[in-house]
Amino acid sequence: MKKENNYISTDMNHKKLIFGVVIIHVCFMLIGASGILSGLKEKNIFYGVLINMIYQLTLIIMIGVAMKQYLITSFKKFKADRISVNIKRVLAGVGIAFLLSYIVRIIEMTMCSNISVSANQSNVNGYFVDYPILAVIMSVIMGPFTEEIIYRGILFRFFSKYGELCAVLSTGFLFGTMHMLFSFGNTNILLFLCQWLDYFLSGILLGFIYKKYKNIWINVSIHGTWNLIVAVIILTQI
């Protein structure tokens, strides 16, 4: 199998489709930031869930077609490692993510007088109240898969031509910024920066994990496990 910078190569016959995945993701996030989705959600939250499901399924289908061999080869490498090894990697990743999030929360409580969740997280919480099963599927399975493919499987490998550290920082910045688009203009600057820092550090962590293991399924597993923990916390508070 041909290698590119030690990463499993993607079939470049589908360059346009891969580019389309990134464009659809960016457009969806920008539309969400514009308030259109919030308006539909206020009329009926099911519209928000439906649009999110269609968006995620569209990306998954496009990714499956464009990056089939990449996903299969990566999964074979992932499965070749002992289960105990992969579990340790996932637990280590989740543990570091928890530590980073805890540090950011301390900074947030120190610097901000009014603390609230980000608009992105608020939208997710709303889905859990009315459609918990669909919310779990979107946040624990679909979201981690599509986000890791976009930010690590595609964008990280694109920026890695300028160096792996550049790839880690660039994708971390984009990951943090995209998750905060919904909050632009809706919160004070200090709170915004603290919430952005939380997502940014998560993106940096996931970037270093991909740099270390060079396997997208490890990233998906860690991202999905973290979201599962968050989902359980949300569901227990409803």
Where are these regions (language model features)?
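Juxtamembrane helix-loop-helix connectors linking adjacent transmembrane helices
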Residues: 42-47, 72-143, 185
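Juxtamembrane/transmembrane-helix boundary motifs at the membrane-water interface
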Residues: 28-52, 109-112, 183-191, 232-238
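Transmembrane helix-loop-helix hairpins at the membrane interface
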Residues: 102-105, 130-238
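Structural signal for the C-terminal ends of transmembrane alpha-helices
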Residues: 64-74, 209-213
